[in-house]
Structure formats: C-alpha cells, structure tokens
Amino acid sequence: MDKLKIEASEALAGNVVISGAKNAALPILMAGVLAETDFVVSNVPNLRDVKTSCELLRCLGAEVSRGDNSEVRISTTSLDHFCAPYDLVKTMRASILILGPLLARFGTADVSLPGGCAIGARPVNLHLHGLEQMGAKIEVEEGYIKARVDGRLKGAHIFMDMISVGATENLLMAATLADGETIIENAAREPEVIDLANCLIAMGAKIEGAGTDSIRIQGVESLKGCHYRVMPDRIETGSFLIAAAVTRGKIRCVDADPSTLEAVLAKLEDAGASITTGSDWIELDMQGKRPKAVNIKTVPYPGFPTDMQAQFCLLNVLAEGTSTITETIFENRFMHVPELIRMGANMELEGNTCIIQGIERLNGAQVMATDLRASASLVIAGLVADGTTIVDRIYHLDRGYEHIEDKFKGLGGHVERTQ
C-alpha cells in the first residue's frame, strides 16, 4: 500500500496548476446517462473516484474512453444495464448520483447503498424522498435502492429538510427529463451545483436559479450530448494556498477560480496573507511571516466550506494565538486531530469544536490518513515538521488530489511516494 514520505521543507514558491474539480466532474459524468448522443467532458482530473465513475458507466453498458489528456468521452447508445453493484459503489459515495439519471431516462434503477469517506451518516433519504415526490416507487432491499417509475417522472415542488449538495444534484438531473416543472427549495448553492446545471443547460435542459436556494426546472423530452469543461477544483486550490501559508511562502495557483473561494481567501487574509487574484489565478504571499490564528465555523456555501476545515486546523496549529474551529456540517470530521496531536499539536476537542493553541513547529511522525481532507492536512503538516513524516493509507488522498506529490515537488516541497 502506497505511503507518502515528507521531509521538512523551505517556504513553498512557484506556480501550481489546479486540476478540474472532482466534486463537479463526478455528477457531470453521471449526467452523461441522460444524453442520447455522445457526451465529451474535459478538464476531468485523473483520480480514483473518476476511474470508479467511468467503470460504473461501463458496467451499465455505456462506452467510455479516456485519452492521455483530461478528456472523457461517453456514449450511452448501448447502455442496457440498470444496476450499480456493491463492488463499485462501496468505495465511492458519489455513486448514488447515478440514481436520478437512470430513473429519469430509463424508468428503473438498482443502486447499492454507497460508501466513501467515513465522516458521518450523510443519509440518502433526501434523495429518495425527493424522487418519491416525483412519482418514483422506491424500496430498499438487501442493501440496494430499487427505484421504478411508470412512464416518466412528474414535476414536483420539493422542500429539502436540510441542505444537501448530492441530493440537490440528483434531483436536478432527474427533473430535467420529468413531465412538467420541478422546484427544489432549500437547494445547495455550491459552485459545483452551478457547474452541473450549466452542463445540463448545454445538453438542452431548462434550468433557472442554480446558485440560489430555489432551483426551477422545466422538464424536456430529451437531452443531447455536448462538449463541457469542468470547473477548477476550489478545494485543491485552497489546500495549496494553506501549504504556502504555513510554510511562509509565496505561490500562484493557475487555472483557478477565485470567485468560488471568497470565504477561504478572506480567512487567509485575516491570517496575514497577502492575496492577489486575476480571472483565473490566485497568488498568496506570506512575506516570510508566521500566520495568525483565525476562528472558523463551517457552514453551507457561500460560507466557509467543511472541505477546508482540516487544512485550517493545521494552519491554526502553527499560527500565532489561540483559535476555535466549529464543524456544523458533518459529525466525525475531526479524525485528523489525534494524528496532529501525535506530531506535537496543542489542540483539544469539545463536542463539535476544536480549541487550538498555536505552536512554532511540529515533529515528524508516522500518521494515518482517515479521510480525504484529513489526509491533505497531514501531508501539509509534514512540510513544516522537524524530521520525517510518513502518511499511511493515502488511497484517501488519491480520491481527491491529482499528482499531489509532483505538484508539491514543483513548489519545492520534499514529498515522495513510497511503498
């Protein structure tokens, strides 16, 4: 099993190219099921979850090809299976996003209950309840969601009990081929939802309000394929900016989108970073200074993202002052804290809040990645830890970061993949 070996590094410096957003690419790939003609998606990152998504589409009978670049081609003319099996779904929670497209286009779907990062319940009931309101008959048997609809789904006025990106995306895709109008209230506003909506519109869907808490969809008879480019990964961008901040460096993230990171950039400025942006780049310069502690509370977009919580925990561990970080989105999302404490961090958990007293340096140690974003924080911690840090179980990292060791090396970081 691969590991990352990290040595203490100097201030990071240089340019890093940001990959396409995994959390946008996965639903967009699933949306290919809705298209009756060939569908081409570019700027798709080469990640384990993307490979699993492509394999899932092939399992359903779709033709999926990927060249040497970041482009994926999908043809569903031969799609003739409607079951997403456990062996594929167990490793990736986003597999549930195949449910809406299959049901909307073919009227039937069997999808194994999903896996993915172990950071809380993240129940699928919001997905199922919304589809039932659209006329689907759903049963859960032997670990499988079995969904059927006679004819086409029907438009519905859906009020979601809580904000859910995945449920918003699933219902949005399903509604594009439903009879009549669907309105999704309390919808997620994340940029990845907007990216999916823009892709669906390019395929012929009629959607208004993506990016607000009320999305209106007029169902159409059919959707066609298109050529669509996935948005930049805002969480990868934020992770590299944190790495530059804690190493007191200066980097530029290119092929990035600053408009999707306003809450993160504001907190980095509060921490003492000098931030400069262009239309597709972000530059951070710490001017050799130690970051200042910042208080964080995770909330749905456009507030501070839960996917940046672990990275800001690390920033505060090394910052000047005392801080609190409160997690309101997922339970069990402080599993990186015991590992950082093993490296010398001064932090304490009280319920869903972490209290952190900043220190100057960490000590290298052998640590274990527990989920995708926690693993990123541990790798960055290794850059500012005296001695050697070994991060085990980096298959979590490979689910969300493309060529991370090469990108860090390009900035001057001492990161090496080993067995």
Curated annotation (Swiss-Prot):
Pfam families: EPSP_synthase. The active site is at residue 117. InterPro entries: Enolpyruvate_Tfrase_dom (IPR001986), Enolpyruvate_Tfrase_sf (IPR036968), MurA_subfamily (IPR050068), RNA3'P_cycl/enolpyr_Trfase_a/b (IPR013792), UDP_GlcNAc_COvinyl_MurA (IPR005750). It comes from the Bacteria. Phosphoenolpyruvate binds at residues 22-23. It is an enzyme of class 2 (transferase). Pathway: Cell wall biogenesis; peptidoglycan biosynthesis. Cell wall formation. Adds enolpyruvyl to UDP-N-acetylglucosamine. NCBIfam families: murA (TIGR01072), PRK09369.1 (NF006873). This is UDP-N-acetylglucosamine 1-carboxyvinyltransferase. It comes from Shewanella sediminis (strain HAW-EB3).
